[in-house]
Amino acid sequence: MENYSSLLIGGKQFSSRLMVGTGKYKSTQDMVASLSNSETEIITVAVRRIKNDQTGENLLEKINWEKYWMLPNTAGCVNSDEAVRIAILGRELAKLSGQEENNFVKLEVIPDKKYLLPDPIETLKAAEILIKKGFAVLPYINADPILAKRLEEIGCATVMPLGSPIGSGQGLLNLSNIRIIIENSKVPVIIDAGIGVPSEASQAMEIGADGVLINSAIAQAANPPLMAQAINYSVKAGRQAFLAGRIKKQDFAVASSPEKNISI
């Protein structure tokens, strides 16, 4: 049987299906402890934060880059030109951290400041450019099955449909479209944004997602390290449940005890 924790992205294998963000933590200590408890191997880093913020430089120093694979993201970019420029800077940051072969980028193009919804047209445009430049592109998108398939066809390493708006904690609001994306996709589907509690992370895995990316649910919890551990367990449980196969839903009851040959 397939190992529940085996995940292949861009030719690189990972033993965890949980990706974790590095923003919004109250302290560096909380972040480091949460990363450890999550057992993640892929962590997202906002390139603009590292480039412009002194605490960003501290972030590079505080994380053991021999243990974690950096996933630079283009958060804050509002068009494809900005996203391409920041992605290139992100690749250089990965090299500075010792990951010479790291060409991953989490592509975010978000002009909408209120709901932080991704721009599908600019995302597709940026993805095409970055793929030609040798990037393994992990695009953050709305739960749009047509866009997801188009991004797969041009060579994206994954597709990352949102569960609900970033940081909203509303869970998986568009399950029908997410299911279609999972059913049609030949690349890993990572649910990104909106997950608020472990049960929602488990639900994403139970319906067949290949992984989840979580930041706010951990970083803004009352006890981030404990929440990271809980979500870690839920992702593993959800994956195992998917592989095990759930019973069919029915409109009537089915007795679990035998109805024949019962001795009294």
From Swiss-Prot:
<comment type="pathway">
    <text>Cofactor biosynthesis; thiamine diphosphate biosynthesis.</text>
</comment>
<keyword id="KW-0963">Cytoplasm</keyword>
<comment type="function">
    <text>Catalyzes the rearrangement of 1-deoxy-D-xylulose 5-phosphate (DXP) to produce the thiazole phosphate moiety of thiamine. Sulfur is provided by the thiocarboxylate moiety of the carrier protein ThiS. In vitro, sulfur can be provided by H(2)S.</text>
</comment>
<dbReference type="InterPro" id="IPR013785">
    <property type="entry name" value="Aldolase_TIM"/>
</dbReference>
<dbReference type="InterPro" id="IPR008867">
    <property type="entry name" value="ThiG"/>
</dbReference>
<protein>
    <recommendedName>
        <fullName>Thiazole synthase</fullName>
        <ecNumber>2.8.1.10</ecNumber>
    </recommendedName>
</protein>
<comment type="subunit">
    <text>Homotetramer. Forms heterodimers with either ThiH or ThiS.</text>
</comment>
<keyword id="KW-0704">Schiff base</keyword>
<dbReference type="Pfam" id="PF05690">
    <property type="entry name" value="ThiG"/>
</dbReference>
<feature type="active site" description="Schiff-base intermediate with DXP">
    <location>
        <position position="106"/>
    </location>
</feature>
<dbReference type="GO" id="GO:1990107">
    <property type="term" value="F:thiazole synthase activity"/>
</dbReference>
<feature type="binding site">
    <location>
        <begin position="215"/>
        <end position="216"/>
    </location>
    <ligand>
        <name>1-deoxy-D-xylulose 5-phosphate</name>
    </ligand>
</feature>
<comment type="similarity">
    <text>Belongs to the ThiG family.</text>
</comment>
<feature type="binding site">
    <location>
        <begin position="193"/>
        <end position="194"/>
    </location>
    <ligand>
        <name>1-deoxy-D-xylulose 5-phosphate</name>
    </ligand>
</feature>
<dbReference type="InterPro" id="IPR033983">
    <property type="entry name" value="Thiazole_synthase_ThiG"/>
</dbReference>
<dbReference type="GO" id="GO:0009229">
    <property type="term" value="P:thiamine diphosphate biosynthetic process"/>
</dbReference>
<dbReference type="GO" id="GO:0005737">
    <property type="term" value="C:cytoplasm"/>
</dbReference>
<feature type="binding site">
    <location>
        <position position="167"/>
    </location>
    <ligand>
        <name>1-deoxy-D-xylulose 5-phosphate</name>
    </ligand>
</feature>
<keyword id="KW-0784">Thiamine biosynthesis</keyword>
<keyword id="KW-0808">Transferase</keyword>
